[in-house]
Amino acid sequence: MKLLSFLCSTLLLTTIAAQITTSQYDNQRTGATLTERTLTPQNVNPKTFGKLGAFKVDGAVYAQPLFLPALDIPGKGRHDVLFVATEHDSVYAFDADRPADPPLWHVSFLDQARGITTVPASDTQCPFIQPEVGITSTPVLDLKTGTLYALARAMAAHTLTLSLIHI
């Protein structure tokens, strides 16, 4: 199993209200959170900022994790949820405040019984992703419909296919 490590502030986890629903924080892909008020040069230092934990996932992570605070998960209650997509064609939902806990849910788009498997990295023109290529790009959360969209690569009957999928 691979571990997804993350860096964040204890203060950030307890007071964050920002949603991260797409790559680089917004549809313009600015990579900036211009309304950030919690993190400052004074509190982002080795004493108050650093790794808080690691989440177990089944493959490498290249996609930016997404975040929704105070999300109601049916049968599981309200959680600050971290969504993580892997190169093993999986999407996870974790309680962001409890990295040692199992995922709130996990979806795999592979189906060995139907011949749907991962794409070996050797079958692609992408040498820096190893050993398999699955969900590389950051998914998108559509808050209006409650849908997570992800683009997964998988092999079906030994043929490379690209599928637009949603959860």
Give a label for each model feature.
Residues L13-T15:
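N-terminal signal peptide c-region/cleavage motif recognized by signal peptidases
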Residues Q19-L164:
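Mobile, glycine-rich extracellular loop/lid and propeptide segments
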Residues K2-S9:
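Sec-dependent signal peptide recognition
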Residues S9-L11, Q130:
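Sterically constrained small-residue positions within well-ordered secondary structures
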